[in-house]
Protein backbone atom coordinates (compact mmCIF):
# COMPACT_ATOMS: atom_id res chain seq x y z
CA UNK A 1 0.00 0.00 0.00
CA UNK A 2 2.57 2.58 1.18
CA UNK A 3 5.91 2.42 2.97
CA UNK A 4 6.22 5.11 5.64
CA UNK A 5 10.03 5.45 5.85
CA UNK A 6 10.00 8.22 8.42
CA UNK A 7 13.13 9.76 9.90
CA UNK A 8 15.54 8.30 7.36
CA UNK A 9 16.95 9.78 4.16
CA UNK A 10 15.86 7.92 1.04
CA UNK A 11 17.65 8.88 -2.19
CA UNK A 12 15.27 9.49 -5.10
CA UNK A 13 16.71 6.55 -7.04
CA UNK A 14 17.17 4.15 -4.11
CA UNK A 15 14.38 1.73 -5.09
CA UNK A 16 14.08 0.35 -8.60
CA UNK A 17 10.36 -0.42 -8.45
CA UNK A 18 9.09 1.80 -5.62
CA UNK A 19 8.63 5.51 -6.26
CA UNK A 20 7.82 8.39 -3.95
CA UNK A 21 4.12 9.00 -3.43
CA UNK A 22 2.78 11.95 -5.43
CA UNK A 23 -0.37 12.63 -3.44
CA UNK A 24 -2.44 11.42 -0.50
CA UNK A 25 -4.04 8.44 -2.24
CA UNK A 26 -1.27 6.98 -4.40
CA UNK A 27 -0.43 3.39 -3.51
CA UNK A 28 2.57 1.20 -4.22
CA UNK A 29 4.85 4.05 -3.16
CA UNK A 30 6.72 5.47 -0.17
CA UNK A 31 6.89 8.63 1.91
CA UNK A 32 9.85 9.93 3.89
CA UNK A 33 10.88 13.01 5.87
CA UNK A 34 13.29 14.21 8.55
CA UNK A 35 12.01 17.07 10.72
CA UNK A 36 14.00 20.09 11.86
CA UNK A 37 12.93 23.41 13.34
CA UNK A 38 12.07 26.04 10.74
CA UNK A 39 14.92 28.38 9.81
CA UNK A 40 17.57 26.04 11.19
CA UNK A 41 20.26 24.61 9.01
CA UNK A 42 20.52 20.88 8.68
CA UNK A 43 23.49 19.23 10.38
CA UNK A 44 26.68 18.93 8.37
CA UNK A 45 26.15 15.21 7.71
CA UNK A 46 22.97 16.08 5.81
CA UNK A 47 24.65 18.93 3.94
CA UNK A 48 27.38 16.43 2.96
CA UNK A 49 24.93 13.92 1.49
CA UNK A 50 25.71 13.34 -2.16
CA UNK A 51 22.11 12.68 -3.16
CA UNK A 52 18.73 14.36 -3.23
CA UNK A 53 16.53 12.79 -0.58
CA UNK A 54 12.82 12.27 -1.04
CA UNK A 55 10.90 14.54 1.30
CA UNK A 56 7.12 14.33 1.44
CA UNK A 57 5.20 16.86 3.53
CA UNK A 58 2.88 14.90 5.85
CA UNK A 59 0.38 17.78 5.87
CA UNK A 60 -0.19 17.62 2.08
CA UNK A 61 1.38 14.28 1.10
CA UNK A 62 3.22 16.01 -1.76
CA UNK A 63 6.76 17.24 -2.34
CA UNK A 64 5.69 20.85 -2.90
CA UNK A 65 8.00 23.26 -1.08
CA UNK A 66 5.55 25.95 0.00
CA UNK A 67 4.86 26.53 3.70
CA UNK A 68 1.83 24.56 4.87
CA UNK A 69 -0.14 26.05 7.73
CA UNK A 70 -0.56 24.27 11.04
CA UNK A 71 -4.30 24.48 10.38
CA UNK A 72 -3.84 21.38 8.18
CA UNK A 73 -2.18 19.51 11.03
CA UNK A 74 -4.99 17.37 12.43
CA UNK A 75 -3.05 16.59 15.57
CA UNK A 76 0.18 15.52 17.12
CA UNK A 77 0.64 13.54 20.28
CA UNK A 78 2.98 14.00 23.19
CA UNK A 79 5.36 11.27 24.33
CA UNK A 80 2.72 9.35 26.31
CA UNK A 81 0.33 9.28 23.33
CA UNK A 82 -2.52 10.23 25.67
CA UNK A 83 -3.45 13.66 24.35
CA UNK A 84 -3.94 14.96 20.81
CA UNK A 85 -2.74 18.52 20.14
CA UNK A 86 -4.42 19.91 17.00
CA UNK A 87 -2.50 22.35 14.79
CA UNK A 88 0.71 21.44 16.62
CA UNK A 89 3.13 22.49 13.82
CA UNK A 90 3.29 23.88 10.31
CA UNK A 91 5.62 22.22 7.79
CA UNK A 92 7.71 23.11 4.75
CA UNK A 93 10.14 21.12 2.64
CA UNK A 94 13.59 22.71 2.54
CA UNK A 95 16.88 21.28 1.21
CA UNK A 96 16.44 17.55 1.88
CA UNK A 97 14.63 18.07 5.21
CA UNK A 98 11.19 19.00 6.51
CA UNK A 99 11.11 22.24 8.43
CA UNK A 100 8.43 22.61 11.08
CA UNK A 101 7.46 25.40 13.39
CA UNK A 102 8.20 25.06 17.09
CA UNK A 103 5.54 22.69 18.50
CA UNK A 104 2.49 24.44 19.94
CA UNK A 105 2.61 22.60 23.26
CA UNK A 106 2.81 23.62 26.91
CA UNK A 107 6.35 24.64 27.80
CA UNK A 108 7.31 25.37 24.19
CA UNK A 109 9.35 28.36 25.34
CA UNK A 110 11.85 25.86 26.76
CA UNK A 111 11.94 23.78 23.57
CA UNK A 112 15.26 24.82 22.04
CA UNK A 113 16.15 21.78 19.96
CA UNK A 114 16.69 22.17 16.22
CA UNK A 115 16.44 18.47 15.42
CA UNK A 116 12.83 17.27 15.75
CA UNK A 117 13.67 13.67 14.74
CA UNK A 118 12.17 12.43 17.99
CA UNK A 119 8.87 13.90 16.79
CA UNK A 120 8.94 12.78 13.14
CA UNK A 121 5.82 10.69 13.83
CA UNK A 122 4.39 12.38 16.93
CA UNK A 123 4.12 15.84 15.33
CA UNK A 124 1.98 14.50 12.46
CA UNK A 125 0.35 11.53 14.20
CA UNK A 126 -3.30 12.00 13.22
CA UNK A 127 -2.41 12.96 9.64
CA UNK A 128 -0.36 9.76 9.34
CA UNK A 129 -3.12 7.57 10.79
CA UNK A 130 -5.78 9.07 8.54
CA UNK A 131 -3.52 8.85 5.51
CA UNK A 132 -2.74 5.18 6.10
CA UNK A 133 -6.48 4.47 6.30
CA UNK A 134 -7.19 6.48 3.12
CA UNK A 135 -4.43 4.71 1.18
CA UNK A 136 -5.68 1.28 2.29
CA UNK A 137 -9.18 2.17 1.09
CA UNK A 138 -7.77 3.45 -2.23
CA UNK A 139 -5.73 0.27 -2.63
CA UNK A 140 -8.71 -1.99 -1.93
CA UNK A 141 -10.94 0.02 -4.28
CA UNK A 142 -8.39 -0.43 -7.08
CA UNK A 143 -8.30 -4.20 -6.48
CA UNK A 144 -11.95 -4.64 -7.48
Regions found by a protein language model. Give the residues of each.
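Surface cap/lid and interfacial helix-loop subdomains adjacent to catalytic sites
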Residues: 1-134, 138, 142
Amino acid sequence: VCAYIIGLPVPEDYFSSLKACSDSLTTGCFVSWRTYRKDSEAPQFIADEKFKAVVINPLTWTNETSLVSASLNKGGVLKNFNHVVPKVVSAQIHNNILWSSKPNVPGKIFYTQKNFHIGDINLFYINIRENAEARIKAFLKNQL
